[in-house]
Amino acid sequence: IDFSSIDVSFISLTKVLLPVKNLLTDDGQIVCLIKPQFEAGREKVGKHGVVRDKAVHEEVIQMVIDYAISIGFEILNLEFSPVKGPEGNIEYLLHLQKHTEGTYENIPFEIKNIVDKAHETL
C-alpha cells in the first residue's frame, strides 16, 4: 500500500498507526485526522465532548507526533481541518511518511502556530 488515510473515532491514533504502517511500502504515506477529543484524557474533554483548550490541542498533537516518530515515521506536514467535527471540535490533518532508516525528528512547522491559526479561523 502506497497511501492510507486514517479517520478513527473513540480510539487513539496510537492504537492504529503501527498496524497501518506495517501495511505500507517502504516510502508509503499516511494522512491521519487528529481528533483531540479522542486523544486527550477524559478530564480534559469538555461538555458535549468538545476540547476548546489550545494547550490540550498542542499536547495531543505533540503526543501523536512523538509516537509516530518513535515507530519510524517522518513528519511531513500538519494543517488544521477546515471543517469542524459534528460537535464543533477543531481537528488536525497530519501527513506522515514511513522512514526506513529509523526515526526522523525534523518537524517542519510549529504546532502552536497551527493551533493558534485554527482557533482564529474556525
Give the residues covered by each predicted segment.
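Short, glycine-/aromatic-enriched active-site segment of Class I SAM-dependent methyltransferases
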Residues: 36-53
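Glycine-rich, N-terminal phosphate-binding loop of Rossmann-like dinucleotide-binding domains
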Residues: 8-9, 34
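Conserved S-adenosyl-L-methionine
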Residues: 72-82
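Residue-level signal for inorganic ion chemistry
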Residues: 35, 88
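A short glycine-rich, Lys/Arg-flanked "PGG" loop and its adjoining helix->strand segment in the class I
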Residues: 14-31
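Flexible, glycine-/basic-rich loop-and-beta segments that form/coincide
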Residues: 89-122
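Short alpha-helix
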Residues: 57-71
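A short acidic, Gly/Pro-enriched loop at the edge of an enzyme's catalytic core
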Residues: 1-3, 15
